[in-house]
Amino acid sequence: MTFAGKLTKAAAFVAPLLGGASHAAPPEAIPAVVEIETPIAATAPLQGYMRAPDGAGRWPAVVLLHACNGNWRQLDQRWAKRIASWGYVTLTVDSFGPRGLKNTCTSGAPVDLAFDAYRALNFLVQQPSVDPARIAALGFSQGGWLTLTSVERGVVEQSAAHKFRAAVAFYPPCLDFKDDMTVPTLILTGELDDWTPAVECRSMVEGRDDYGISRRSGDGVPIRLIVYSGAYHAFDIPTPGALDYFGHHLEFNRQAADQSIDDVRNFLYATIGAKEPVKEQIK
């Protein structure tokens, strides 16, 4: 998987966001289109699905970022619906549709994609149902890279007016991160992942990289790495069997998937808070 290197400043954007209800049991509300900004210079509007818990108040929130194959609607159904039922506002971003992209698994992500998490964050902090001090980013594969890029001390994080308070990255590519994370960060990956190897994430977490550069002891915020035994890339996505995708092995692992639900819920509860965690499984 190829990902963009240097980052450039992203343009302003128009962001139609589809909203829905949160609880699994009641029927979902009819999605509503929300227009965020209408600058004349906008060339890549941002869109997505937004869910909110029932009831008044200001809720913690999570921005969800999809992988290099898009599928943001499936991500909303698979993870955002669940997280919203825990008591969080969720915003699942579609980075590809407005850009006319279908897949960036071999071509690499556009450089301005790295700012999409903050474009979503800037929208959420304006919502009366969101607590602006309790917003996390959660991404998968390429979206995991975007998540880590968003909270790594560097040009993206430092140029942002508002900040994330926590970050979760599922099986991200961990190469090329040379600086510290600025918020509590959780990385979840599979022991047998042959696309974004766990060993690369372990090196990053331990402050080592392939350039021989190590983070200074005591700097930044600690990163927690969880490696699921026997799990491959995309272990949380239910599929009928193993798949070969661009030469990489993808396979659902129920044990790892169920455990990741608990791990994410516990981490979010500890960092930005909502309902107290209880055991849950993938259906």
Ranges and model annotations:
Residues 191-245:
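Active-site-adjacent alpha-helix of alpha/beta-hydrolase-fold enzymes
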Residues 1-11:
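Bacterial N-terminal signal peptides that target proteins for export
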Residues 9-19:
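Bacterial N-terminal signal peptides
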Residues 73-75, 86, 117-182:
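Primarily recognizes the serine-hydrolase "nucleophile elbow" in alpha/beta-hydrolase
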Residues 55-59, 64-102, 176, 194-198:
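Short substrate-entry loop that stabilizes the transition state in hydrolases
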Residues 187-189:
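Short beta-strand/loop motif that positions the catalytic acidic residue
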Residues 244-283:
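Catalytic active-site module of serine/aspartate enzymes centered on a nucleophile-bearing elbow/loop
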Residues 25-57:
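N-terminal cap/lid segment of alpha/beta-hydrolase-fold proteins
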